[in-house]
Amino acid sequence: MGKIKIKKNDVWIDMTPMSDVMVLLLTFFMLSVNFTKNEVVKVITPGSTTKAKVSSSAVLDITIDPEGRVLMSTDKTVTMEKALDQMLKEREASLTPDQKKEIIVFNQIGIPVKSMPDFLSKSHEDQVKLMKTTGIPTDSLQNREDKMSEFQLWVKAMKNGYKEWYNDLSDAEKTEVSATKLEINIKADKETPYSAVKLVIAELQDINESRYKLVTQAKKLEE
């Protein structure tokens, strides 16, 4: 007696719902994660057991490398653009629109304003070397009655730049923004001399900027 052959039907699974879930999860993680900024000079901050968190938006990061050189960056391009324009005016220097874009692309300021034209004439490799070996001047500028340093001028320019951007927002747009002003973070390398950190803090206090956070990395409590 012959065997009855059962016809096999092709199995078809609709993967559309699974794809939707994957896209949703990917979007969630992209929105919730804090991406590391592409900075020329990076530091390894000292460990700390504090649980206070540092803001990831509307921040002015002041970086102090192991040799005490000071650099500056912010998370908002528009803040950097406005601050750069103000600093060029303060230091009586000029850059073309394309040159300004080149400076902003670095996402970190680490050279004197008047050195920027010469800085931009060099190769990218030489530019990176200069950024790593120069820093923003913290000495008082000559011919200024207020005796402010270029570092102090940058801090004020950054804060003013963010304030201008915020004030230009509509009332509806302001409800979407969590910070009304720029928050200052100080990131010093664990090998940075204390005197260099003390100098930066003194420079901030001289311009009435006494609210700031010292950035550290999490460290477990020793049992």
Segment roles from a protein language model:
Residues 1-4, 13-14, 56, 172-174:
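Short hydrophobic/aromatic-rich motifs at helix boundaries and adjacent loops
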Residues 3-40:
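Hydrophobic single transmembrane helices highlighted by the model
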Residues 36-223:
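Long, low-hydrophobicity, acidic/polar, solvent-exposed interaction domains
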